[in-house]
Amino acid sequence: MATARTFGPEREAEPAKEARVVGSELVDTYTVYIIQVTDGSHEWTVKHRYSDFHDLHEKLVAERKIDKNLLPPKKIIGKNSRSLVEKREKDLEVYLQKLLAAFPGVTPRVLAHFLHFHFYEINGITAALAEELFEKGEQLLGAGEVFAIGPLQLYAVTEQLQQGKPTCASGDAKTDLGHILDFTCRLKYLKVSGTEGPFGTSNIQEQLLPFDLSIFKSLHQVEISHCDAKHIRGLVASKPTLATLSVRFSATSMKEVLVPEASEFDEWEPEGTTLEGPVTAVIPTWQALTTLDLSHNSVSEIDESVKLIPKIEFLDLSHNGLLVVDNLQHLYNLVHLDLSYNKLSSLEGLHTKLGNIKTLNLAGNLLESLSGLHKLYSLVNLDLRDNRIEQMEEVRSIGSLPCLEHVSLLNNPLSIIPDYRTKVLAQFGERASEVCLDDTVTTEKELDTVEVLKAIQKAKEVKSKLSNPEKKGGEDSRLSAAPCIRPSSSPPTVAPASASLPQPILSNQGIMFVQEEALASSLSSTDSLTPEHQPIAQGCSDSLESIPAGQAASDDLRDVPGAVGGASPEHAEPEVQVVPGSGQIIFLPFTCIGYTATNQDFIQRLSTLIRQAIERQLPAWIEAANQREEGQGEQGEEEDEEEEEEEDVAENRYFEMGPPDVEEEEGGGQGEEEEEEEEDEEAEEERLALEWALGADEDFLLEHIRILKVLWCFLIHVQGSIRQFAACLVLTDFGIAVFEIPHQESRGSSQHILSSLRFVFCFPHGDLTEFGFLMPELCLVLKVRHSENTLFIISDAANLHEFHADLRSCFAPQHMAMLCSPILYGSHTSLQEFLRQLLTFYKVAGGCQERSQGCFPVYLVYSDKRMVQTAAGDYSGNIEWASCTLCSAVRRSCCAPSEAVKSAAIPYWLLLTPQHLNVIKADFNPMPNRGTHNCRNRNSFKLSRVPLSTVLLDPTRSCTQPRGAFADGHVLELLVGYRFVTAIFVLPHEKFHFLRVYNQLRASLQDLKTVVIAKTPGTGGSPQGSFADGQPAERRASNDQRPQEVPAEALAPAPAEVPAPAPAAASASGPAKTPAPAEASTSALVPEETPVEAPAPPPAEAPAQYPSEHLIQATSEENQIPSHLPACPSLRHVASLRGSAIIELFHSSIAEVENEELRHLMWSSVVFYQTPGLEVTACVLLSTKAVYFVLHDGLRRYFSEPLQDFWHQKNTDYNNSPFHISQCFVLKLSDLQSVNVGLFDQHFRLTGSTPMQVVTCLTRDSYLTHCFLQHLMVVLSSLERTPSPEPVDKDFYSEFGNKTTGKMENYELIHSSRVKFTYPSEEEIGDLTFTVAQKMAEPEKAPALSILLYVQAFQVGMPPPGCCRGPLRPKTLLLTSSEIFLLDEDCVHYPLPEFAKEPPQRDRYRLDDGRRVRDLDRVLMGYQTYPQALTLVFDDVQGHDLMGSVTLDHFGEVPGGPARASQGREVQWQVFVPSAESREKLISLLARQWEALCGRELPVELTG
């Protein structure tokens, strides 16, 4: 090991260098000589063959003129003989010694390289480094690359600087030491990597060499590895600039790196702190250091040296020996901390040391408890893998952290617990869907299970509060069966409870174990009534028609099993009921699906029940088969005899357990259809099947029942009539058994699922004639002997597929051909293929591109609340509206009214596609016999499609109402168009799956979306009460003048362009629209006849941090609809809000992302690229994620896909509802590509990637435009990609390169977010001037034109009959030095978007009228129909019309247009300029120009 040379002037002269040949070795056919070179205490070896010596000698002779005979001669014969080699070793050693003695000062370059001085000797190392930097230094600095250097090189440079020799002793300018110093002064990124053990072939221990880093003056990042921190000097010289420091495999304490001065001073304090006692030194802090990596060292404690790094954000102390976490309270800016693979065993009080931490890595420690993490409220990423966490209760400490998104618990003892993932996710409650566990995306099944368990836990908590104190403990421990209310004439029959009740096991879907009390609560609807006080509901009819108003007593509407909510003596106001009738609602409870075919106790219980049934059933099967064989030839009997015989056969073939009245009710109903003639083929089929089914020995069959599959499902049994029930299908090796899950008779009972199962019937495989999928992946059909007996099985896709596959395996291949059906699907057809066929059958445009995102079986209930008894009359209208019961028929546009009663209680399927909600109704009538249909009949399905943009979650359901496990897990209220629909999901998990898919699809929609704007609650004195007589919203809406298109008067023909969309038929909501061509007209904004401003509600108390007081004040001030813009009731309500109510409205009704924040509000009229002729009022809301346009209702018919009358017709439910339905257009900031600013900031256009994402805001006010663009740029700047806190596979220093900044080029600002802001150029001004000059009567004056004022305004037309205000026509007013013009401008098509493939059909500017300023007679100004409207009165001077080449006459007597004055001597322009600043500027410039031209002041008259 080499020892370091002493530093300082008293160092002795350099010892002479020596070179000795210490041996040789034979390599291939030549001899290699081993040379040992000594330079002081450093030694290294070099190997050369004789030819290398010869080449060296030739060069030295040529360059340095040494003696030619100095080198031993070459031998041809016997050159490898031992004697010759030994003699040559001595001669070569003498040769090298003579060379070194001949050059004592500077060793020649060729000799230095021959002896590897450039690798191991100080002068050679520095010379080689200097030469390298001379050639590549500038290139390295310019590229900003990391420069890697070794400790030996730094040691050599340090030694050279200490010797005081000339910087270029060799005389070669390339090796001048100044090249190194020049490079180090400017280098920013440095990497010093040592080696373990001897360096190369030397004895130099590189990691122990001292070196000085003070020669580096501009370092931003330094990475040091495999060095000794005690021997590193000068690093502190980089404190002012160093931002990132990494020291690995080099330090034993943090002080060695951060405070090397600590070894010299006993007491020290960081600079800038208050000194409390005597100190020997004040140490400057690391002013710029934000990232510190001290991983893979031997650090045993976090000492007080961290006081010197107050700005640190990223701290990595992984792979050390830390025992406790200390002193981190001094790091106020610390965001990311890595303490992995240390020896931490306790985290107590960690929140007092870590304030704003976001990423915390504690992997590989000795942690058993997580209690110290419960207050780290800003934590986002947490890694706890490879610890000793055993108890699930420890996860609760982090389950309440509000920002936590990524958690890793792998390789802990608790990770081997069954259902570990689901149980951990359940600890996060409502945030379970936001948490990613163990770097694995949470599956939908896991999230659905968590949601159900949350509902169960909620129901359990409510039940524990309401439970009777005297209730026996044993009663609480029993599991509950599914809730059921039967007609009073049908008492339930419950199988005897078994002595030992097996526990449910986990299925492959990840269902968790749940507590028994929670299971009992989950299967009963929860309200404040105790079980003793709950009345049993009366029997419900088959149809779900509305209950007459006078018959719905309040007691009848209380909570019943299967219903949700309810009234309570303690409640001041009733709750919403959503279920039409308990007897009609069947659903599969969540608790049962934990029992599978792998649960031995469960299988044993089922086997016993099936065995008992078979003992009684086998004789009936044989007898039925004999009767069929005897009756095969008997045909042509009377119809009543056939029905009687068939009924007897059915009773003999199926053994049912249950009360007789139930069987009678099930067997009655509709008459049996006439049996079709049996063909010879069917008879042979039955005979083969019977032989196969009964081929086994009867005793053997009873003793060896093997259960293959258990399927929990929703079952529709068609046997003449339709019967539905939740069922358990058991597939055995001999046949199929059907069990029913009965409803719970009373809420007080909590029967176990197993003991509640009721055996219905069973049949052998031989009785199965057809089976397949009615709808792929959704509904499996089993057709039992005779077509009237059909089972429609509804379950999830995975279980249905497994059951179908297991059933197929029970049949021999030759039998499968007989069981295939031409009208059923096989297992290979996908749901996507079925959807494609269905849409093709209904001739849906683009149906082939539709992709199914999920399909869900539900009951659908829609309400017409006029038919329902409401609450007491002392409630306000809104409360009365919300408290009625949804008891009405299932009605959809896909079924006729006559079919609604017949199919009221049959489930439908809701199928979600990216753009639509598809309602599918299947035909569950008895299936025809085999052979009667050669193809699938798509008429058996009825389809209704609703645009997904019009489907909303019902806003009337209060999330604070106690609902119970049934409602939480199965019931969902929807608003479809104007209809309120309740969907009751029959399968567990499906509701939460539907919500997840629905929310994803809604967020991805790019068209107009429906939003709900809640009205301010209150009585008649509220803002809504400002309308006289409390007229309904429907009438109020009819008073609003909608945006419409009106024709402009034209005498000369103009080329016809694309016509406007045909107006919708006049509805009760508003007057008929006037059709007009789009080219010859622009939108006319017709104001409301009587503007009514609602008083603002009292401001609500604002949250602490967001929104800020400044934001609340600013939005309140900006939230005023300009008087000239028409407004519908929803927009007027939005404008009436003040204070934090605006923020609350944004988050509750408009915002799409949970964590987005409102930044700016603005009112403006907007024009969409797809409807250029329509200008509509909008409330523009800018958030941190998107720009939202809440639009006037008049735009709905232009954008939205037409709904069928049933959905689209407004009814009394909507008219009296406590909210408005409005349209909202969303432009995500991530889709924003460019912003085009109009001339003089009068408007701006936001452009996305598609035509539907282009919208122009016509602010007509430069201040509004400027404010919006300023806020938009701020928001876009915050969306710039931030560097990832986790290390990635890229260059260590790449994050500190040049960052993209905004730059202005050619009137385009490329924002740092890559959004392009385009401003008007001088060329656009020239185009406008040229356009005006071309239309003038004297175009030769065009060069003299200079634009003084450009403003977008309105021209006021003649008011229509019965109205006091005239329509406003958008115009562009242009004032030059001697003329004034009115133009029609296309603000949405220009400049052309990137996706445009051809120029627009309309010109950008179309001159409408022009007058000379000198012809202006006077200006009338006052408070006419519009505040501060200006009337410009011109003398109609003959021969001086500027519009000589324009034949349009805009001043004829056409109704609605401006008219000439009497005697035709005056022409009036009535102009309304919305911006007060622009209005004053127009008057002042006009007056100045008029005075310059006419020599006197412009007459300005004030009118009333």
UniProtKB/Swiss-Prot annotation:
The modification N-acetylalanine is found at A2. Residues 660-869 are annotated as: Interaction with LIMK. Signal peptide: none annotated. GO terms for biological process: actin cytoskeleton organization; apoptotic process; negative regulation of cell migration; Rac protein signal transduction. The keyword Membrane applies. Residues 463-501, 524-547, 554-573, 628-687, 1016-1104 are annotated as: Disordered. Residues 120-695 are annotated as: Necessary for homooligomerization and targeting to endosomes. The modification Phosphoserine is found at S541, S543, S546, S1022, S1284. Residues 1063-1078 have a biased composition (Low complexity). Residues 245-869 are annotated as: Interaction with PAK1. Residues 2-133 are annotated as: Necessary for binding to phosphoinositide-3-P. The modification Phosphothreonine is found at T1282. Homooligomer. Interacts with GRB2. Interacts with PIK3R1; probably associates with the PI3-kinase complex. Interacts with IRS4. Found in a complex with ITGA5 and PAK1. Found in a complex with LIMK1 and PAK1. Interacts with ITGA5 (via cytoplasmic domain); this interaction is direct. Interacts with PAK1 (via kinase domain); this interaction is direct and is increased upon activation of PAK1. Interacts with LIMK1 (via PDZ and kinase domain); this interaction is direct. Interacts with LIMK2; this interaction depends on LIMK2 activity. Interacts with RAC1 (activated state). This is Nischarin.
